[in-house]
């Protein structure tokens, strides 16, 4: 049996852009040929694509690092470097992608073929042909390629099912799924026979169809991790209707009503929204002795908890083993699904700010200035650091261009206001230079 994995932590890194080239046209009969260095190619992006054929996150168990290729360097004759191909990473339907640092949801991938650029490749550096001006017709300036985005991610798979079967172990969930669909879950006369979610397609006699999931049995304390705990409670979150399966024969020696209350408490503790979903009570094993009497007692206790009869959940007595009462249950489930909307899985507070995450939002500050214990002024900030890494520090003209960019951003003036003096050390990343006033 293939292993089921529904969570994974991975890192993704997009490719770096290729460096621009400094080159000059030197041909016979072409005086003053001018700059001829081309741009670097763009780095490859990391793209997640949904594949309906995948059922688990098992592929990410041993392969946790995904790195796209970098773009090629620019060439002479003004030719651009080749851009790198994007790296496509396939994920199953129902995969939620979170930022590992903040826990915020980046995207919920639910449609087959759906794609998202999860880490954008760096743009290629410009060659010196781009920097020619009337004042400087032969520039010795070219940019380094921009680094690709790098992210730490958490993947969480929540299977796509319209209906979820919940209940204590050995109440007959797997048997029910096996007789109403073509699914073949493992069935046994012991607890936790089902240790992975099973999914089956159900078709009613009236022609309606829906996906039903058999989830591993819950026990008291599951929401705190007891038994299989929260490992599989997450799979209930996408369902629109819950079928609460109860062993009405009390063959395990437990009271059916106490089972019902206990499981609902676990659902509510795990996620308050789960109790917003409509729930049908499936009174299973009605072909067993004591089941009828237990059902009467169950209904009496249940009614005592409701003020109005209309509020009572629907109860369907069935026997999965004897194939009794199944048609009525499935028809009622289909009708309930037809009038039940999708439930929002996440609040806005759970989601990343897309503009900020993907770099579209304008920040108030382009840079920050701090001072180390050794009296070195430290410059930081996303825009400033990006300009720095794209500057070729081996060429004087590139360094002078970077200095002009810093002045244009107001860095020099800000350093003076903070008290920087001529000759003070200034650091950007690992590069250190002296402040010139």
Curated annotation (Swiss-Prot):
Molecular function GO terms recorded: GTP binding; GTPase activity; magnesium ion binding
One Pfam family named in its UniProt record: DUF1967
CC terms in the record's Gene Ontology section: cytoplasm
Keywords: Cytoplasm, GTP-binding, Hydrolase, Magnesium, Metal-binding, Nucleotide-binding
Family under the similarity heading: Belongs to the TRAFAC class OBG-HflX-like GTPase superfamily. OBG GTPase family.
The protein's assembly and partners: Monomer.
Full protein name: GTPase Obg
Native source organism of the sequence: Streptococcus pyogenes serotype M2 (strain MGAS10270)
């Amino acid at each position: 049996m293939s292993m089921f994995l529904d969570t994974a932590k991975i890192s993704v890194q997009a490719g770096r852009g290729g460096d621009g080239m400094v080159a000059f046209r030197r041909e016979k009969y072409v005086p003053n040929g001018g700059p001829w260095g081309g741009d670097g190619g763009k780095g490859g992006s990391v793209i997640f694509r949904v594949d309906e054929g995948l059922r688990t996150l098992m592929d990410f168990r041993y392969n946790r690092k995904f790195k796209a290729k970098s773009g090629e360097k620019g060439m002479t004759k003004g030719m651009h470097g080749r851009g790198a191909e994007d790296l496509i990473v396939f994920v199953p339907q129902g995969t939620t992608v979170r930022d590992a640092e903040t826990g915020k949801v980046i995207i919920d991938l639910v449609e087959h073929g759906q794609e998202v650029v999860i880490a954008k490749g760096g743009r290629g550096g410009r060659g010196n042909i781009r920097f020619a001006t009337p004042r400087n017709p032969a520039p010795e300036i070219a940019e380094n390629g921009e680094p690709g985005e790098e992210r730490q991610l958490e993947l969480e798979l929540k299977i796509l099912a319209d209906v979820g079967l919940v209940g204590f172990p050995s109440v007959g969930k797997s048997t029910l799924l096996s007789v109403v669909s073509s699914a073949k879950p493992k069935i046994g006369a012991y607890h936790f026979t089902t240790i992975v979610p099973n999914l089956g397609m159900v078709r009613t006699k009236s022609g309606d169809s829906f996906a039903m999931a058999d989830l591993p049995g819950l026990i008291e304390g599951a929401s705190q991790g007891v038994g299989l705990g929260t490992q599989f409670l997450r799979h209930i979150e996408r369902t629109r209707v819950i079928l609460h399966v109860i062993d009405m024969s009390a063959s395990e020696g437990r009271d059916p009503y106490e089972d019902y209350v206990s499981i609902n408490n676990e659902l509510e503790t795990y996620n308050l929204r789960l109790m917003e979903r409509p729930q049908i009570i499936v009174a299973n094993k009605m072909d067993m002795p004591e089941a009828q009497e237990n059902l009467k007692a169950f209904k009496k206790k249940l009614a005592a908890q409701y003020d109005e009869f209309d509020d009572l959940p629907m109860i369907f007595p069935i026997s999965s083993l004897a194939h009794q009462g199944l048609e009525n249950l499935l028809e009622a489930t289909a009708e309930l699904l037809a009038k039940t909307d999708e439930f929002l899985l996440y609040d806005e507070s759970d989601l990343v700010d897309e503009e900020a995450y993907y770099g579209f939002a304008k920040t108030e500050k382009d840079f920050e200035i701090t001072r180390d214990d050794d009296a070195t002024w430290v410059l930081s900030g996303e825009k400033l650091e990006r300009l720095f890494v794209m500057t070729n520090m081996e060429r004087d003209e590139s360094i002078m261009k970077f200095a002009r960019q810093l002045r244009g951003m107001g860095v020099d003036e800000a350093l003076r206001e903070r008290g920087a003096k001529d000759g003070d050390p200034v650091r950007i990343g690992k590069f250190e230079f002296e402040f010139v006033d």
